[in-house]
UniProtKB/Swiss-Prot annotation:
Record field: transmembrane: 43-63, 67-87, 119-139, 148-168, 177-197, 236-256
Gene this chain is encoded by: nodJ
Protein name from the UniProt record: Nodulation protein J
This protein's UniProt keywords: Cell inner membrane, Cell membrane, Membrane, Nodulation, Transmembrane, Transmembrane helix, Transport
Domain ABC transmembrane type-2: 33-259
Single GO BP term: oligosaccharide transport
């Protein structure tokens, strides 16, 4: 990996807003369909698995399985919304539409563009996660005031997965390789991170792996708060999410700089 030059880093505190605004204006035209698409999978899990398995499993950790599952789906929806925005929409803007190339002819640096794309992906993640949170509160699976606490965590989750996905987008030569990331990383992470069943049901080896997954840290922050329980190890989980935001960001900058100059 090459050295990240200062020209590739963000050139100002707010230059990325131009990229965010451009994506927002384009998204407004398809906003209803986009929101419904982000809600579809989590709602299927909540009503499908929650209603079906909830009857058989009863309570999980002192709460109904539906409430347990719904809290996990808040984090999961943020992960999927951010990931899909970055590995597909951002990848298309970078490679097919050549939107990035046009932006680089302005005063924006590569860092400004990447930061703006990540912020936009986190915005979509926040919308998706908050929407699921509102549904869970409406169904009395969580308290309304818990949404105030979990919203920043949803945003951090969106940034973390946007940063990770940006590395994938920088490395992928075609859309086919993006599917590998979705199938081999995102889907297993959904299963292993405690979104649909407690991680205590996993083997000790898999539990150790779970502690390294960003989705697991997000769920460990969101679920207790939504269920009215104390949140243990807040600093650890927040630090892990911040690490997943910062390190992949600089890695993606270096990879994208090399890719775009070839």
């Amino acid at each position: 990996m090459g050295r990240v030059s200062t020209e590739a880093l963000p050139s100002g505190l707010l230059n990325w807003v131009a990229v965010w605004r451009r994506n927002f204006l384009a998204w407004k035209k398809v906003a209803p369909a986009s929101l419904l698409g982000n809600l579809a999978d989590p709602m299927i899990y909540i009503f499908g698995l929650g209603s079906g398995l909830g009857v058989m499993l009863g309570n999980v950790g002192g709460v109904s399985y539906s409430a347990f599952l719904a809290a996990g789906m808040v984090a999961t929806s943020a992960m999927t919304a951010s990931t899909f925005e970055t590995i597909y929409a951002t990848f298309a803007r970078m490679r097919d539409h050549r939107t990035w190339e046009a932006m680089l002819y302005t005063k924006l640096t590569l860092g400004d563009i990447v930061l703006g794309e990540m912020a936009w992906a986190a915005t979509k993640a926040s919308l998706a996660g908050t929407a699921i949170g509102i549904v869970t509160a409406t169904l009395a699976y969580s308290e309304w005031d818990s949404l105030i606490y979990v919203f920043p965590v949803i945003a951090l989750t969106g940034l973390a997965f946007a940063s990770l996905s940006m590395v994938v987008a920088a490395l992928a030569p075609s859309y086919d390789y993006l599917v590998f990331y979705q199938s081999l990383v995102i889907t297993p992470m959904l299963v292993l991170s405690g979104s649909v069943f407690p991680v205590e049901q996993l083997s000790p080896m898999l539990q150790r792996i779970t502690h390294l997954l960003p989705l697991a840290h997000s769920i460990d922050l969101i679920r207790p708060a939504m269920l009215g329980h104390p949140v243990p190890d807040i600093t650890l989980h927040l630090g892990a999410l911040c690490l997943y935001i910062v390190l992949p960001f600089f890695v993606s900058i270096a990879l994208l700089r090399r890719r775009l100059t070839q």
